[in-house]
Structures are given as C-alpha cells and as structure tokens.
C-alpha cells in the first residue's frame, strides 16, 4: 500500500509500506479520508516524544471496512485503543485506561496511522 510516512523531523516520505495485519476483533479499513491534527503537526516538528519516526501518522480517519461484521460499511475510526480488562474499561470509561494508546503513535507501542491506503 502507499503511505505518507513521517521519516524525520519535518520530513514526510510517500512510499510503499506493508499492508496492516488483521487483528482479532478489528477490521481492515480502506481509508477514504484522514485529517491532519495538531498533534500530527507537533510530531512533524519533532515536539512529541510519543511519535517517533518512522511512523505513519493520522488518527482522524474514515473509510470502508474490508472484513468482519462491518464489511462494506462506511466507518469512522475511534483512534483510542484500550485494554478492555481494567476497571475503567469494564465501566465504559476507556478514555481513562492506564494501558491506552492511539493509532498514529509509537509509544507505548507502535500502531500505524491513517495517512495510508489501509489501517487496522
């Protein structure tokens, strides 16, 4: 797939990347639109230690689901990834999950963003 990759401070490279792997319980999304957020700009300028190159930025994403229950449906991605196991997640307060992360971030774990043809 083609993706716009943050490769260095103030440097983005349009290049071929591997398609995202299917993750149990998630869908592969064919990206139709992806916004550029202020936090993406902070990363671009080297001002966000949670986003380190190389990384596909972009966490404001919509597109068409390619698999699963939502196959062929238009979807808007919730960029928040929570553990679904802690007391906050079990009480529908995923935004407080101590293990949470987001797409388009490299810390606490790498999860590629939506400035690409596909996202998981």
Regions found by a protein language model. Give the residues of each.
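NAD(P)H dinucleotide-binding glycine-rich loop of Rossmann-like/cofactor-binding domains
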Residues: 83-120
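Extreme N-terminal starter segment of soluble prokaryotic enzymes
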Residues: 1-2
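Glycine-rich beta-strand-centered segment in the early N-terminal region that forms part
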Residues: 20-34, 47-90
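Short Gly/Pro-enriched turn/cap motifs at secondary-structure boundaries
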Residues: 18-19, 52-58, 106-111, 117
